């Protein structure tokens, strides 16, 4: 009994996958050859060419739909296949986006409808009127447009040349040289910042010194030189008192004997 899930497969040792190409699976297109089946109603009344059966508007069919490959601007034109209800002959009709309608293609012809013919005629007349209303371009306008186009083209070519020059310059530049230049720029900016900081600090010191060594009137107090200045000896307080007493006319209240003794002591000391 074979394995149900086929988990293990035997591969012989002499198997070469390159000899046997992989199988190409055919895409499943369905019973209608890849055409979609849609449910629709006939958009107009028609008459079959094979049996002459009339198919009225609004009759429901299971139609096959496909793209014709043609487009009106960007709108795809579609084709629908139906069969006659009497003889089973194939009838096709396509979409008409230009007139917002449908048109019979093969197997049947559209019945005469006066409102439809009138509508088509009005549409054609309006289209012709629009074409006639468009003024013919003047020769001067053509020349101006041509000059503008040439100017625009020159600007585009200049921009392209600049881009080419930039790319060539970049290709010529060595990576090491670019790194060295970047480093130099970085070091130069750092040195500039340091010099600015030093200058700012010096200005701050000068401001503080001016604020400290200036008087209330705003005059600057200058520092005396140590070599030119001479320190003066301060007089003793006893000498000051004696000088004051000598200059003043204060009477001497000492007794005569004490005064004589004092004078004698001074003479002895001298």
UniProtKB/Swiss-Prot annotation:
Region (Disordered): 1-32, 251-270
InterPro entries documented for this protein: Saf4/Yju2 (IPR007590), Yju2 (IPR043701)
Entry keyword set: Metal-binding, mRNA processing, mRNA splicing, Nucleus, Spliceosome, Zinc
Pfam families: Saf4_Yju2
Entry's localization field: Nucleus
Recorded GO MF terms: metal ion binding
Residues the record lists as binding Zn(2+): 48, 51, 84, 87
UniProt feature, compositional bias: Basic residues: 258-270
GO CC term, one of those recorded: U2-type spliceosomal complex
Biological processes, Gene Ontology terms: generation of catalytic spliceosome for first transesterification step; mRNA cis splicing, via spliceosome; RNA splicing
Family: Belongs to the CWC16 family. YJU2 subfamily.
Function in brief: Part of the spliceosome which catalyzes two sequential transesterification reactions, first the excision of the non-coding intron from pre-mRNA and then the ligation of the coding exons to form the mature mRNA. Plays a role in stabilizing the structure of the spliceosome catalytic core and docking of the branch helix into the active site, producing 5'-exon and lariat intron-3'-intermediates.
Subunit-level organization: Component of the spliceosome. Present in the activated B complex, the catalytically activated B* complex which catalyzes the branching, the catalytic step 1 C complex catalyzing the exon ligation, and the postcatalytic P complex containing the ligated exons (mRNA) and the excised lariat intron.
Name of the protein this chain belongs to: Splicing factor YJU2
Gene name of this polypeptide: cwf16
């Amino acid at each position: 009994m074979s394995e149900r899930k086929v988990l293990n497969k035997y591969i012989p040792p002499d198997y070469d996958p390159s000899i046997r190409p992989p199988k190409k699976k055919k895409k499943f297109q369905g019973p209608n050859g890849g055409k979609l089946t849609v449910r629709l109603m006939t958009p107009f009344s028609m008459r079959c060419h094979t049996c002459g059966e009339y198919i009225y508007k609004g009759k429901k069919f299971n139609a096959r739909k496909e793209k014709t490959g043609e487009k009106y601007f960007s709108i795809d034109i579609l084709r629908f296949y139906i069969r006659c209800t009497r003889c089973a002959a194939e009838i096709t009709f396509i979409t008409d986006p230009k007139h917002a309608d449908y048109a019979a293609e093969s197997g049947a012809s559209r019945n005469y409808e006066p409102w439809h013919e009138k509508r088509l005629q009005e549409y054609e007349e309006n289209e012709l009127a629009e074409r006639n209303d468009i003024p013919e371009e003047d020769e001067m306008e053509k020349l101006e447009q041509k000059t503008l186009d040439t100017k625009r083209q020159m600007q585009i070519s200049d921009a392209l040349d600049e881009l080419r020059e930039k790319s060539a310059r970049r290709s010529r530049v060595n990576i090491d040289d670019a790194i060295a230049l970047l480093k130099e720029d970085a070091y130069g900016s750092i040195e500039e910042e340091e010099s600015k900081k030093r200058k700012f600090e010096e200005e701050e010191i000068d401001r503080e010194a001016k604020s400290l060594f200036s008087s209330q009137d705003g005059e600057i107090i200058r520092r005396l030189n140590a070599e030119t200045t001479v320190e003066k000896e301060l007089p003793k307080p006893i000498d000051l008192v004696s000088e004051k007493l000598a200059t003043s006319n204060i009477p001497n209240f000492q007794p005569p004997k004490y005064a004589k003794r004092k004078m004698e002591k001074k003479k002895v000391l001298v």
